[in-house]
Amino acid sequence: MTMTGQQLYPIGDLMFEDLVDVYKEQAEVVADAGADLFVVETMMSLQECRAAVIAIREVCDLPIMVSLTYNPDGRTLYGTDPATATVVLQSLGADAIGINCSTGPEDMIEPVEKMAEYATIPILAKPNAGLPELENGVTVYKTGSEEFASCGKKLVEAGASIIGGCCGTTPEHIRALKEAVKDMPVHKPLTQKRRILTSERKLVEITLDGNFMVIGERINPTGKKKLQAELREGSLNMVRQMALDQEENGAAILDVNMGMNGIDEKEMMINTIYEVTSTVDCPLCIDSSHVDIIEAALRIYPGRALINSISMEKEKMDKLLPIAEKYGAMFILLPLSDAGLPK
């Protein structure tokens, strides 16, 4: 499975749910045909990766490997770095994360090292046989099998435990690679999970070292008559400016709440997610008293979000915890149970 070639909204016209349906149709056919696992590869968009993983997980529980391609600046076409992609996709349920096609093997070492800092799942690397060159109208790859295999050893040392070859590689490349790495120790993923939120382009780690972390809570219509009026008109100009102002003033995370009368709260929440994620790089905190609105927001959010909040009341936990798990979200837990406030 790979990219569709279409641009997702709001950059293009393809809606997220339509893309999930495309991948789901493919996943159903492949799973029914007897596939052992899914490989989602040569991906340039983290959001398209999310759509593919969600689609597969809604069809079956077969293993999923997801591999992105990165530009020379270390980011995808849409600005995602390897660490952010790793955090998002492993929290969403991918079984392996990696890089393929982008470059030759030498240039994959640094991205693999960055993934290894965060990966709790195996890392895969499938480089090209060097960068493509055009000779007499024919595309050629000039990295020979021995050089390819030598760099493959460095990829294993960097943290890759699943390796192979992409464009320009031949059976000789793979044979040499196997011989070079067959006796090397297999890299083990991290066992300690870290508290990390992300947007599509940035990650924020929540540490317990006493450092103060600012969550901006201005995007909330409660007590803001001008914002309420704008939202009823369908305008998000104030929301956009609030997001920019809070990021500029040092907010690490932005809380988004659309709870008010006179609007379709779910539709406005979704529109706000699109607007804010297109405007700033801060991860978002989804704030609503309605379970369906929280789920709708998490489904289209192109990162790993925070839920504000989940109380310890059984009914609410039974509804929200499976949603948080499905979309890989973190949550604020309120110590309020069916027995009331703790003493």
What residue ranges belong to the model's regions?
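Domain-level signal for soluble alpha/beta catalytic cores
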Residues: 1-343
